[in-house]
Amino acid sequence: MQVYGCCELVRELYAQIGSGDQGYIPQAISCAVKALNDIAADESLPKETREKAAFAAANLLISDFED
């Protein structure tokens, strides 16, 4: 996926990280899994949203890509 296929908020943060205005996290996969896990665990969110986050986190965890 390219950055231009992402929502405006993602594109804004991407630009800020690229310019040095926002911090870069070298262990991006771990950061993503933690964020997705937080979303999946948040019972105030719709079940469909939580399931999408859980599915994405599980796929990242099972992939052979490591930080």
Curated annotation (Swiss-Prot):
<protein>
    <recommendedName>
        <fullName>UPF0253 protein VV2574</fullName>
    </recommendedName>
</protein>
<dbReference type="InterPro" id="IPR009624">
    <property type="entry name" value="UPF0253"/>
</dbReference>
<dbReference type="Pfam" id="PF06786">
    <property type="entry name" value="UPF0253"/>
</dbReference>
<comment type="similarity">
    <text>Belongs to the UPF0253 family.</text>
</comment>
